[in-house]
């Protein structure tokens, strides 16, 4: 009986990542479109703003300080889905998956500062760079100056990414940190404006 249950669990995860994305519900919202509930607002916040349409904007300040908006909670296995739009400047952003050390993956949004080209949906590992380019065979998938959907699953040390409904990444990081917060990045040293909306997070 135990073997049957285990096999069912394994097949469930296999089908999840063969057939695609999860269904998120209202209760899974991590951003309510009105407040910073569920998030740790940086001290003297001048970067993160919410407008009347429920859109979260991250805008560089004049000194290009940069900022990260962290979730209050820490997560083990989880899935996050959001929509983003690159508004202005050289956008270098992303989602920190369980922290920002060399044991953590960041899913890139926009231009890589080191590679000087767009690496959206690709994993970035601090001190190691980009081990794989997610959109190498899907260069027309990313919509410039329009809304894009991004869904990321972190299951143990495995990371799965969908951009605009298409599976583009299946990556594993050896010795990955398996618990930590989620962060939205406004990269320092850049002049940029990026927007987010419809953000959901579900523990797995």
Describe the function of each predicted region.
Residues 20-204:
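Carbohydrate-interacting regions of secretory-pathway proteins
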Residues 1-22:
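Bacterial Sec-dependent N-terminal signal peptides
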């Amino acid at each position: 009986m135990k073997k049957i249950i285990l096999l069912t669990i394994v097949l469930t995860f296999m089908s999840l990542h063969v057939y695609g994305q999860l269904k998120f519900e209202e209760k899974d919202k991590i951003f309510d479109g009105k407040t910073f509930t569920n998030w740790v607002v940086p001290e003297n916040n001048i970067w993160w703003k919410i407008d009347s349409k429920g859109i979260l904007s991250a805008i560089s300040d004049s000194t290009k300080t940069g900022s990260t908006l962290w979730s209050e909670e820490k997560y083990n296995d989880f899935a996050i889905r959001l929509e983003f739009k690159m508004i202005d400047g050289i956008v270098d952003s992303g989602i920190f998956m369980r922290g920002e050390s060399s044991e953590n993956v960041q899913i890139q949004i926009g231009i890589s500062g080191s590679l000087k080209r767009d690496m959206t949906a690709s994993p970035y590992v601090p001190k190691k760079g980009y081990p794989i380019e997610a959109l190498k065979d899907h260069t027309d998938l990313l919509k410039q100056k329009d809304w894009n959907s991004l869904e990321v699953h972190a299951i143990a040390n495995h990371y799965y990414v969908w951009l605009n409904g298409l599976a583009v990444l299946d990556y594993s990081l050896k010795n990955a940190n398996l618990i930590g917060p989620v962060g939205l990045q406004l990269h320092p040293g850049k002049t940029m404006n990026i927007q987010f909306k419809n953000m959901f997070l579900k523990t797995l």
